[in-house]
Amino acid sequence: MSSTVWILISILLATVGAVVGFFVRKSIAEAKINGAANEAKRILDEANREAEALKKEALLEAKDEIHTLRTEAELEIRDRRSELQKQENRLMQKEENLDRKDETLDKREQQLEKKEDSLVARQQQIEELESKVGELVQKQQTELERISNLTREQAKAIILGKVESEVSHEIAVMVKESEVRAKEEADKKAKEILSLAMQRCAADHVAETTVSVVNLPNDEMKGRIIGREGRNIRTLETLTGIDLIIDDTPEAVILSGFDPIRRETARIALDKLVQDGRIHPARIEEMVEKSRREVDEYIREVGEQTTFEVGVHGLHPDLIKILGRLKYRTSYGQNVLKHSMEVAYLTGLMAAELGEDEKLARRAGLLHDIGKAIDHEVEGSHVEIGVELATKYKEHPVVINSIASHHGDTEPTSIIAVLVAAADALSAARPGARSETLENYIRRLEKLEEISESYEGVEKSFAIQAGREVRILVKPDTIDDLEAHRLARDIRKRIENELDYPGHIKVTVIRETRAVEYAK
């Protein structure tokens, strides 16, 4: 019973609590709604006030901007009006200037018309005077023809002939003086260039040798070199083409031969055999082959070093090797490689003085005797062989012509070719460059004079400049100018056929005619 009552009481209390809570929440919600409405009204009022303020501010800014634009427009209109006024003033000034120029031109036109009228009048006067002068000249010519018994054409021919004779003589004198002066200046310049080139080029004195000497540790080695029944020495001589001279010279073997490359190969091979101690035909053959390879490599190195020293680049490798062979070639005792380098230096120096291509000149000078490296192996002169080599390896046409013309076989086609020939003569002619015994030298001078004096009409001959020139004095009443040229050619041919000489020999025939008169 009591529990049921408590349950009912609890339910009743819960119901009352729920009703009370409902009304409380409702009153709270209504209060919040009223607060929110009031807040919204307040915000709306503030927004209206701010909008009104912004509207007034925008109106004020718009008024200021309108005022500013109006002011700028007024200033721009004022500036344009001022500029238009200035342009109008300038146009008015130009118009005034044109009016003044127009007046000036009118005045000048009037003056020119007056001058033209004056010139027409003067021209008429001149024509009248010319007519009168022509009549007077005609009368004078007629009178002169009557007095001199010569027509006008005859008199003109006489005067022109006399003038032509006088002018021709004066021109001939002037031409001769110019030629003499030009020759003197050219000779002077050539001497300066040659002296400068020779001063700046230093070269060695060389001498020819046809033997080499190999030193031995003792004389017992000579027997080992000879071998049993001479088989070792025969093998070495057969393989190298060099004669071995074993005599009483202590501790030395002499190698004799005219081919320097073979002689050098034999020397190196024999030196290696002596150092090795094993000397028999098989070992000799091995050492000779090894020495040939060493000599070939040395020749190539010499060629490369030569081109580097002279400053010539771009040569074909085969041509460099052929150039190195010149180290073992001599001409009248002068080493051909040293001679070629000397010619290259001299040609380059002279070309530089004349404003020519110095590098091309050195190249031509270095290769001018390239044919001498193999002229003993190939048919033909060293000039022909050199031209073939240069053409084969596509050298410059100037280089080819320099090789072909440096001994006068063909005409030089460039200044460099002439310089190469001059440098070749300088290198060969300098003291000590080429060896020649005193006996041969004197015999050659005597033979030169003997050949020259063997011709009819020759009065006297002189061999000068160490036998490099022969001067022949002829009788002018027996030998005329044309005969003098023929005589020089004949003597030159006989010298070439009958004499052996280094370099060139210049043949000069001198015919002197003297006319003497005595004024009393």
Curated annotation (Swiss-Prot):
The keyword Transmembrane applies. Residues 86-116 are annotated as: Disordered. Keywords: Cell membrane, Endonuclease, Hydrolase, Membrane, Nuclease, RNA-binding, Transmembrane, Transmembrane helix. Residues 336-429 form the HD domain. GO terms for molecular function: RNA binding; RNA endonuclease activity. The chain crosses the membrane at residues 4-24. It is found in: Cell membrane. The keyword NADP does not apply. GO terms for cellular component: plasma membrane. One of its GO terms (biological process) is mRNA catabolic process. Signal peptide: none annotated. Coiled coil: none annotated. Residues 210-273 form the KH domain. InterPro entries: HD/PDEase_dom, HD_domain, HDIG_dom, KH_dom, KH_dom_type_1, KH_dom_type_1_sf, Ribonuclease_Y, RNase_Y_N. Endoribonuclease that initiates mRNA decay. PANTHER family: RIBONUCLEASE Y. Belongs to the RNase Y family. This is Ribonuclease Y. It comes from Bacillus cereus (strain ATCC 10987 / NRS 248). The gene is rny.
